[in-house]
C-alpha cells in the first residue's frame, strides 16, 4: 500500500458514561485512557505524514447517540463508529482504510481486583486482511513490551498474576496469532479492522503499567509501528 493512499482510523473505547469501564480504585477510566492513547498515536502518525482520523473523541454521548437506556445508547454509539469508518471507506476505498480500536480488557465485572493480564489483538472470524494487521501489531508488541513480559514473570512470584497468564494472549490454532470475536465494530466495518486489548483494568500491576509513562509509550509504539509495518507490507 502506498503511504499517501493509507487512511488510518483509530477507535476510542466506550463513553465516559458507560458503566463499569474502570479500575476498581477508579484511577484508570478506560474511555479516558483510550482517548489519550488515540490522540497521541494520531498526532505521531500525522507527524510522519499519514492521514489519520479518530472515530469519536468526546467523552459524552452526542445528541444522536442518546437513548432511553444504557444499552440503547451503547448501540447508537457503536453504530455511529461503524458509520464513520464506512463513510471513509466509501470515500477513499475500503482497501486503503484500516481501523484500530483501542481498549483495556477486564477479567470480571464485579469491581474487584483479579490476577489476569496480557495484551491481545482481536479480529472478526475467518481469514481476512485484518489478520495481517493484527500480526504486525503483535510483532511490534513483542519488541516494545519486553519489559512488561519480564514484569509479568516477576509478578507471578508475588501473586499479581496467576501462573496461567501470558504477556501476549493469542490463539494460534488457525495458524496466526490474533484472537477472534464477534465484536460489532469488527464485523460491520468494511475495511481491515482490529480491536486491541491493552492489558487489564482490574489487575493492579497492569493498571500501574498502563498509567505509567513507560507503559503508555510502549503501547503507543506497538500500535503505531504495527500500523506502519502493515502499510509497508500490503
Residue ranges and their predicted role:
Residues 2-132, 217:
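Catalytic-core regions of hydrolytic enzymes
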Residues 6-9, 19-20, 105-108, 156-234:
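Active-site-adjacent mobile loop/cap segments within catalytic or ligand-binding domains
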Residues 36-42, 132-148, 208-234:
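Long, well-ordered alpha-helical scaffolding segments within enzyme catalytic domains
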Residues 40-50, 144, 184-191, 229-230:
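A structural motif corresponding to the C-terminal end of an alpha-helix
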Residues 50, 119-122, 138, 183, ...:
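Aromatic side chains
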Residues 59-83, 88, 146-180:
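Charged, glycine/proline-rich intrinsically disordered loops and linkers
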